[in-house]
């Protein structure tokens, strides 16, 4: 079981790092070209094999296909990113937990809690990401770190605690605000790529928590 769990954690971390990259910064021309490659399309097809993710992966692939026909695709997609995630007006979907959990204020209690968690686990935020620690990209990256770190554990009791910590993080730091974030993305993202990514992130996180909770029961 331990070897199977290590493989699973590596796959989970890969998906979390990928999701984090979508909300980290605008996609470059090279990034967009990769999304049209056989390698990435195979990766997405693999995700779609999971029934709970199938619909959201389909929406993301449809948006990527539309992107091939979009004039000035990179510039237009960068504008979508800016309008959704970088503007502080009512027609945006800011990717910070504090906005949804702390009277709409930036850098609130969720950011402080994330700072404490990152420090406790010795995780440093990338220097070029000048954002509060409750940014979605940072939270997803941290979850990937927790998944990979669990692979260093050999004893089942400690492993159960590590899995519980991941489940608790999802409950306390992501599912508290991600549904509202995904809803706002859907409301304000006319083209639909980032709203599809947000809904896929939410679906994967919900499914991952269910999987973690089952694993916790098995390791007891």
From Swiss-Prot:
Cited Gene3D superfamilies: 1.20.120.1820, HscB, C-terminal domain
One Pfam entry name: Nitrate_red_del
Alphabetic keyword roster: Chaperone, Cytoplasm
InterPro entries hit by this protein: Chaperone_TorD, DMSO/NO3_reduct_chaperone, HscB_C_sf, TorD-like_sf, TorD/DmsD_chaperones
Entry's Gene Ontology cellular component terms: cytoplasm
Tree of life domain: Bacteria
One of the GO BP terms on file: protein folding
Annotated localization: Cytoplasm
Function: Involved in the biogenesis of TorA. Acts on TorA before the insertion of the molybdenum cofactor and, as a result, probably favors a conformation of the apoenzyme that is competent for acquiring the cofactor.
Family according to the record: Belongs to the TorD/DmsD family. TorD subfamily.
NCBIfam families: PRK04976.1
Protein name: Chaperone protein TorD
């Amino acid at each position: 079981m331990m070897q199977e769990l290590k493989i699973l954690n590596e796959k989970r971390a890969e998906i979390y790092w990928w999701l984090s990259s979508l909300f980290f910064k605008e996609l470059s021309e090279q990034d967009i070209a990769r999304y049209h490659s056989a390698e990435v399309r195979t990766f997405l097809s693999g995700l779609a094999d999971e029934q709970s993710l199938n619909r959201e992966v389909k929406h993301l692939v449809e948006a990527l296909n539309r992107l091939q026909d979009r004039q000035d695709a990179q510039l237009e997609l960068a504008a979508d990113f800016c309008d959704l995630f970088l503007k502080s007006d009512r027609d945006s979907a800011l990717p910070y937990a504090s906005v949804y959990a702390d009277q709409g204020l930036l850098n609130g209690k969720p950011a402080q809690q994330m700072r404490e968690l990152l420090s406790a686990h010795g995780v440093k935020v990338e220097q070029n990401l000048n954002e509060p620690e409750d940014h979605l990209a940072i939270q997803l990256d941290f979850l990937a770190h927790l998944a990979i770190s669990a692979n260093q554990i050999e004893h089942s009791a400690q492993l159960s605690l590590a899995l519980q910590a991941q489940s608790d993080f999802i409950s306390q730091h992501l599912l508290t605000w991600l549904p509202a974030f995904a809803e706002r993305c859907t409301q304000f993202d006319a083209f639909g790529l980032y709203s599809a990514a947000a809904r896929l992130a939410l679906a994967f996180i919900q499914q991952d928590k269910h999987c973690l909770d089952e694993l916790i029961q098995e390791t007891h």
